[in-house]
Amino acid sequence: MKLHGFLFSVLSTCVVILPALAYSEAVTMVKSIEQYFDICNRNDSYTMIKYYTSWCQHCKTLAPVYEELGELYAKKANKDDTPINFLEVNCEFFGPTLCTDLPGFPIIELVKPRTKPLVLPKLDWSSMKFHERLWQRIKTWFNNPKYQLDTSRVVRFEGSRNLKSLSNFIDTVRSKDTEERFIEHIFDDSRNCNEELRSQQLLCKAGKEYYSDTLSKLYGDVNGLEKERRRLEALIKQNGDDLSKEVKEKLKIIRLQLSLLSHIEDQLEDTSSHDEL
């Protein structure tokens, strides 16, 4: 980020005055850098962001679709869903700061929740003079996690900008992220399955048992892992047509076991690739 862009960011801690437009309550217009990062760096919600300009024709076409999307998720949210924030960033005001790396407009991105709490540096601002505070802000800007967004948490939408495609995009990213977090929970010995939703606790316990009794003993055994994969895939194939509730529950556990096995294989592959380098 260039210096003039940063200085713009510092000044923008004051609320930017934006044109008065009609927006639904489900979509929030970003008015400051502070507001943008405060929302995007939450660990309890997803954040959908639309970057746009007033002169972009595609942005004008997208505007009512995006508002409808925000309203749709506000209506269908239930207590077990992780909330989704819907933001709009006007890149005519935030071009030097929030929009510097964008290839064009409009751009839509979904930011996944943080997996760990945000740890901020502790500074004694009250003991500093004005120019010292300003200089300290400049020095810490690039390293302050409050004003950073981990790119691994950002998924960019690529597709037709209609309600169905955008809704499918959100559901797919959220479903995959939920599964990844669930798998990480199972591998984390310090975490208890009681932390999960009640509906997921039995599945979590089955996953931890499988990891402890089977996968932990196969770690590093490529042939053993491949044999176990074939066994699980055969079970799914043999019972895939059985619609009974009991078999469905067993298949759910087997598919989880397959996901855990894939996670182990990916880890081994990453380790192998790193060793080759």
UniProtKB/Swiss-Prot annotation:
Q: What is its EC number?
A: 5.3.4.1
Q: Where is the Thioredoxin domain?
A: 27-172
Q: Name which cysteines form disulfide bonds.
A: 56-59
One annotated GO molecular function is: protein disulfide isomerase activity
- Fetch the Pfam families from UniProt: Thioredoxin
InterPro entries, per the entry: PDI, Thioredoxin-like_sf, Thioredoxin_domain
Q: Where in the cell is it found?
A: Endoplasmic reticulum
Q: What is this protein called?
A: Protein disulfide isomerase MPD2
Task: State the organism named in the record.
Answer: Saccharomyces cerevisiae (strain ATCC 204508 / S288c) (Baker's yeast)
